[in-house]
């Protein structure tokens, strides 16, 4: 069947089973938007900024495991999208981002809204394409979805000149891809896995170190089963929250710069670190030469470039994590494992001696209390998104996560402004469920993409934004207090809008909360009304995120809270 290049794009998305697209139109992509107008195979959400379009597609992808899709125009439309691309690239989120480009006859002439989009996207995408002829559109989009979702996932950028979207050719959508140089290693090396299993059997203090790859490979429940069958304790990175279920007695906590005392001590004292889809990020390891320095290391990852990049493993295994962990489970009966009970009990003692806690108050709301109370009120009914800052760490520490993909945050890039558009994408993914999409944010972060409240209202996307409002850029203020002799340079945010009036101006529901009773009432009311909402929680200004491993220190060299009795 013959059709325009623009219709090919829309038809290809339909062929890939796309249900929701986020985007913002403009001149170079207008032909594609004309075809979107004519179709009813997928829904299009009009964001109010291209960065939000990409991040909303991320939120959708993180919540569902599907490939998110966003469409933007050329020039500033694309440059606005770059932060979202970089965020998805750092966290390995599968996206296909389609951008318009100036006509091929104008490329290279500094035409209106021309930018070298593929040159810009090269370092922040898994792969990118500039479409040179209309016949390539079906193949390229098919390849883009395949590349984005296989191996180590990531964003793929497809740049299409406007004249190519106007041309007409035969549409033939390929049934499969032919990429001879792209063959991700899925199946593990059996010999290496046997060596790793022997190492586990002989270890005295093994530890599962679970990273974001466990979410991406959908093997959270297999990892729980592995931990429980072998009685091995587990720690999670920021990106892996929810894998183990916080109530699991083998869960020792989140590790890293703001990890739990017991989790960080577990990594420091283990004699066998079993890395499952983790990449040894600097915010996790602390001083690298001291990280798990007493341990042999098993590193399982689908990306061979991640292995030995920072820590040289004794047992490197390249392969799909879900397939590999299933094989580990199936082979358990072939080995005699040590009894790890004493090790498990030692780590439980650590958690009891130095639990996560804060000094509560009857006179003001502590931000940690707000997160903890939110967890008590919503528990597993909510999918939690966050922005970046102190509130992000408190959310990771104090919200009780119980299943994979319950947590949506910007880890690698640390993108302020991530929370609201990501929570929108999550909410679209949750439309047919009874789950609630909640964005835990700060008074700094929320203003970075505040315009998306309009999008939420227009499409009735019921995101509940909980602002932990301390009138500071809180994490920067904390570092200035701890490491810069309290020189608070440009971190005071006392001059802020009235957030209740602001959300009401956008057409949403607003609440201002200064007592614990008001907090409970606001959360319950927002959940019941199922409308876009913003809860401005006035919290104590000078709280710090603790524990904290200062830069250049080992994980066992934590700054801990003095006092406090609330776990």
Per-range role (PLM):
Residues 6-9, 14, 18-19, 32-36, ...:
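Active-site diphosphate/adenylate-binding microenvironment
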């Amino acid at each position: 069947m013959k059709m325009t290049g623009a219709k090919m794009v829309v038809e290809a998305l339909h062929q890939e089973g796309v249900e929701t697209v986020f985007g913002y139109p403009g001149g170079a992509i207008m032909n594609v938007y004309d075809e979107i107008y004519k179709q009813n195979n997928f829904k299009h959400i009009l964001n109010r900024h291209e960065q939000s379009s990409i991040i909303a597609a991320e939120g959708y992808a993180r919540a569902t495991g599907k490939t998110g899709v966003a469409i933007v125009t050329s020039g500033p439309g694309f440059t606005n999208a770059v932060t979202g691309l970089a965020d998805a690239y750092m966290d390995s989120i599968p996206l296909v981002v389609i951008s318009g480009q100036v006509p091929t006859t104008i490329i290279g002439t500094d035409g209106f809204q021309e930018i070298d989009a593929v040159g810009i996207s090269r370092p922040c995408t898994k792969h990118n394409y500039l479409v040179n002829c209309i016949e390539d559109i079906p193949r390229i989009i098919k390849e883009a979805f395949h590349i984005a979702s296989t191996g180590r996932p990531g964003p793929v950028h497809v740049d299409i000149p406007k004249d190519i979207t106007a041309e007409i050719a035969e549409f033939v959508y390929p049934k499969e891809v032919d990429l001879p140089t792209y063959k991700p290693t899925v199946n593990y090396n059996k010999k290496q896995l046997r060596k790793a299993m022997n190492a586990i059997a002989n270890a005295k203090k093994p530890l599962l170190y679970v990273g974001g790859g466990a979410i991406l490979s959908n093997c959270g429940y297999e990892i729980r089963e592995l931990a429980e069958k072998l009685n091995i304790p587990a720690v999670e990175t920021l990106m892996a929250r929810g894998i183990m279920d916080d109530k699991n007695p083998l869960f020792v906590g989140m590790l890293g710069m703001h990890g739990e005392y017991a989790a960080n001590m577990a990594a420091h004292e283990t004699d066998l670190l079993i890395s499952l889809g983790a990449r040894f990020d600097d915010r996790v390891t602390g001083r690298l030469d001291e990280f798990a320095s007493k341990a042999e290391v098993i590193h399982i990852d689908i990306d061979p470039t991640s292995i030995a990049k920072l820590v040289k493993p004794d047992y490197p295994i390249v392969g799909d994590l879900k397939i590999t962990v299933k094989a580990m489970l199936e082979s358990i009966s072939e080995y005699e494992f040590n009894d790890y009970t004493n090790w498990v009990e030692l780590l439980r003692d650590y958690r009891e001696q130095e639990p996560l806690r804060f000094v509560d108050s009857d006179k003001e709301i502590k931000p940690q209390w707000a997160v903890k109370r939110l967890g008590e009120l919503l528990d597993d009914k909510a999918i939690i998104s966050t922005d970046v800052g102190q509130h992000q760490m408190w959310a990771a520490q104090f919200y009780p996560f119980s299943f994979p993909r319950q947590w949506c945050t910007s880890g690698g890039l640390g993108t302020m402004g991530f929370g609201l558009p990501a929570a929108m994408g999550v909410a679209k993914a949750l439309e047919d469920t009874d789950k609630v999409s909640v964005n835990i944010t700060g008074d700094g972060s929320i203003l970075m993409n505040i315009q998306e409240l309009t999008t939420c209202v227009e499409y009735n996307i019921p995101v509940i934004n909980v602002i932990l409002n301390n009138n500071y850029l809180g994490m920067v203020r904390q570092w200035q207090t701890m490491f810069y002799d309290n020189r608070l340079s440009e971190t005071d945010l006392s001059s802020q809008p009235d957030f209740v009036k602001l959300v009401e101006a956008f057409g949403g529901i607003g609440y201002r909360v200064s007592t614990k009773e008001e907090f409970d009432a606001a959360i319950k009311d927002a959940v019941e009304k199922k409308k876009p909402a913003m809860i401005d929680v006035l919290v104590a200004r000078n709280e710090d995120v603790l524990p904290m491993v200062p830069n250049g220190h080992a994980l066992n060299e934590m700054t801990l809270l003095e006092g406090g009795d609330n776990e």
